């Protein structure tokens, strides 16, 4: 198990745009180790997803996967998946709001609205191409993680900064994490 350091909001790397992953890169031992490290880091931090920029790697790589996550009680499981070079297209103007947190913004949450349904095109770690329509909680998770690849944090998407704060304060004043 190799857990990497997660960068925090304020680190300039988190604000940079990531480069696509090439099919040659996915064949390397270094790439395979990076993917293992990303999953180890995500699980250790009890995250639902992790993007490569969060550990200082400016590549378009996201890993997701979560069952019974204590940080987000009552949310559906997210199957493990490796997402490379994603392209997201909103399929509706309808949005849903969710109290989002981030491993790079520890101890805080903010209410973010995102498109309910998206189309996501991506490549997996074997070079297979995918094109899928995604909705619900999974769509929120994928959009949040893929934002990292463009140098965007969820705090950039807050419409109302009064709906942003520390977990403990929000727990007692808004009952959002019951």
From Swiss-Prot:
Gene Ontology molecular function: any one: metal ion binding
Keyword Hydrolase part of the UniProt annotation: yes
Substrates-to-products reaction catalysed: N-terminal N-formyl-L-methionyl-[peptide] + H2O = N-terminal L-methionyl-[peptide] + formate
EC class name: hydrolase
Pfam families (alphabetical): Pep_deformylase
List of residues binding Fe cation: 102, 144, 148
CDD domains with a match to the protein in the record: Pep_deformylase
Cofactor binding remark: Binds 1 Fe(2+) ion.
Keywords: Hydrolase, Iron, Metal-binding, Protein biosynthesis
Active site: 145
EC number: 3.5.1.88
NCBIfam families xrefs: pept_deformyl (TIGR00079), PRK00150.1-3 (NF001159)
Similarity comment text for this entry: Belongs to the polypeptide deformylase family.
Protein name: Peptide deformylase
Protein source organism: Leptospira interrogans serogroup Icterohaemorrhagiae serovar Lai (strain 56601)
Protein's gene: def
